[in-house]
Amino acid sequence: MLYAAGVEPDVFCGDADSVSPEVAAWAHASARTDIRFPSEKYATDLALAIDCARHEAARRGAQLQLTMTCASGGRPDHVLAVLGQLAASADAQARIVEDSYECRVLSPCGASSWMVGDEEGALGATLSAIALRPDTVISERGLKWELDHRRMELFGDLGISNVVVKPSAEVVCHEGVLAVFLVRQGASIS
């Protein structure tokens, strides 16, 4: 993605086993910092990248903020592992931005709310909220079905397929960790 956009990475971290040799060579040469790992290891590249980003944020005295794309590589098993990694790093204010949707991980120890009504094309869009920790408590305003300090079951379906109806729409995570998906209108997640 960075290669195609012509954006050079600050840090390259991983084994480069899921990109072409050309892109791997470019990433290794372009990054200011290049941290390589063997392809056979006991952690995913995402887990290593989060640790690397946490270290870099601490070195800079900055708060950890993660924005990702192509995070799952199109694999359903990776989707669940990605959400698990982001739940374990709830302070990271994580965002996954894809063509058809955006996902934010909310938690009181990181970004606790998302003003979804501020997003371009949000009005009328589908919004789903899924608890990534037991006993997650959320509020939703400006959606077709609103919730007020409602406790959610881990991976339960209470927050699935809501609709943004007001420009002031907001989702707040009071306790636990929450994945909030804003699905772009006309898009389907495959």
Label every PLM stretch briefly:
Residues T69-A71, V97, I130:
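Short beta-strand segments
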Residues G14-A16, A57, A88-A92, G117-E119, ...:
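Short, surface-exposed linear patches
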Residues D99, L106-S190:
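Long, charged alpha-helical interface segments
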Residues A16, P38, E98-S100, R133:
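Residues at the C-termini of beta-strands that transition into short coil/loop
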Residues S18, R36-S39, D91-A94, G121, ...:
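Glycine-rich loops and low-complexity Gly/Arg-rich segments
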Residues M1-D91:
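Acidic/Gly/His-enriched mid-domain segments of enzyme catalytic cores or analogous surface patches
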Residues Y3, V7-P9, A25-S30, A47-A53, ...:
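Low-complexity, flexible helical/coil segments
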Residues S89-R104:
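Short, acidic/small-residue loops that bind anionic groups at enzyme active sites
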